[in-house]
């Protein structure tokens, strides 16, 4: 069986991490990677050097995950609002795995509720809402499968994505 790399992208607060972790419970053996783990700099800094560091770290982890004989599914979640970033990360990985790219979408109202809840809980910075809503405009033109998270639980999303993965594996 060919391995599968499932890439979940979308704005902050749309539900990538929660749905991705649920997905790992449905597709086994699997491993979960959040791109944010590779950019947990203190203080946070966006420079050419830090961008290169993060990209190199993510590519290395994805390759190692796909090379592991004990892993059939790699679930990778990250904001990925720029198509060039996604292309650079995934370059050459199609030789190691079937790649399924999915953008999780939400209405501005739904996204605002989720991000505000995270801000109130101290899980996100106060400016996260503004950035998350601004990033919404980058996703409609991406050549990915789009799934709405509005009114859906992470379990429902994970069930749908697992079904898509299984259907593609059979075709």
Language-model segments: residues:
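Hydrophobic anchor at the beta1->P-loop junction of P-loop NTPases
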Residues: 8
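ATP-binding Walker
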Residues: 14
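Glycine-rich phosphate-binding loop used to anchor ATP phosphates in small-molecule kinases
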Residues: 53-96
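Conserved phosphate-donor/acceptor-positioning beta-strand/loop module used by diverse small-molecule
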Residues: 95-115
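Small-molecule kinase domains that catalyze NTP-dependent phosphoryl transfer to phosphate-bearing small molecules
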Residues: 117-160, 168
